Curated annotation (Swiss-Prot):
Pfam families according to UniProt: Triabin
Cellular localization per UniProt: Secreted
Organism expressing this protein natively: Meccus pallidipennis
Tissue specificity of this protein: Expressed in salivary glands.
Protein name (database record): Pallidipin
């Protein structure tokens, strides 16, 4: 009987830990000041989707308390009908891990109010000027939503630094959702 109880508890614990975000390690020698000096970027590629991810822009400002605020805007059309959303997110550096953040976002709930969601992020790589690879992990009611986003200061093309980083981890942008392949003005 003790073995059955122990096995059951172990199974419950394993399931609980399996439902947590597992962030990839951030890039070496991450510099917070340099990273947040990139004020405006476009999501040009998304590893897991959904395709609407690549119709987003991030605008970041520094706050006096050491946090940063990112305004995430999303604009696209589906069947001619326009969609616009704005998320206001506060990025707080995780204690002891440079390049990882706990992020609180305010999401409009459709009733004129706002709902808060919690996102964990890790800056996998950046050149502090033109691009960043950002892992984003959100725990939802239906499970874990994990993605890697390519953020770039230009909407089109791929910075050469990105290509070498992706090769080092055996990833290819050919398999990712791309802003150039998704028509944000008429998504189907």
């Amino acid at each position: 009987m003790k073995v059955i109880i122990a096995a059951t508890l172990l199974g419950i614990l394993m399931h609980a830990f399996a439902e947590e975000c597992e962030l990839m390690p951030p890039g070496d020698n991450f510099d917070l000041e340099k990273y947040f000096s990139i004020p405006h970027v476009y999501v040009t590629h998304s590893r897991n989707g959904p395709k609407e991810q690549v119709c987003r822009e991030y605008k970041t400002t520094k706050n006096s308390d050491g946090t940063t605020t990112t305004l995430v805007t999303s604009d696209y059309k589906t069947g001619g009908k326009p969609y616009h959303s704005e998320l206001k997110c506060t990025n707080t550096p995780k204690s002891g891990v440079k390049g990882q953040f706990s992020v609180e976002c305010e999401v409009p709930n459709g009733n004129g109010g706002k709902k808060k969601i919690h996102v964990e992020t890790s800056v996998i790589a950046t050149d502090y000027k033109n691009y960043a690879l950002l892992q984003s992990c959100t725990k939802t009611e239906s499970g874990i939503a994990d993605d890697v986003l390519l953020l770039q200061t230009k909407k089109e093309g791929v910075d050469p630094g990105v290509t070498s980083v992706l090769k080092s981890v055996n990833w290819s942008l050919d398999d990712w959702f791309s802003r150039s392949k998704v028509n944000c003005d008429n998504m189907k």
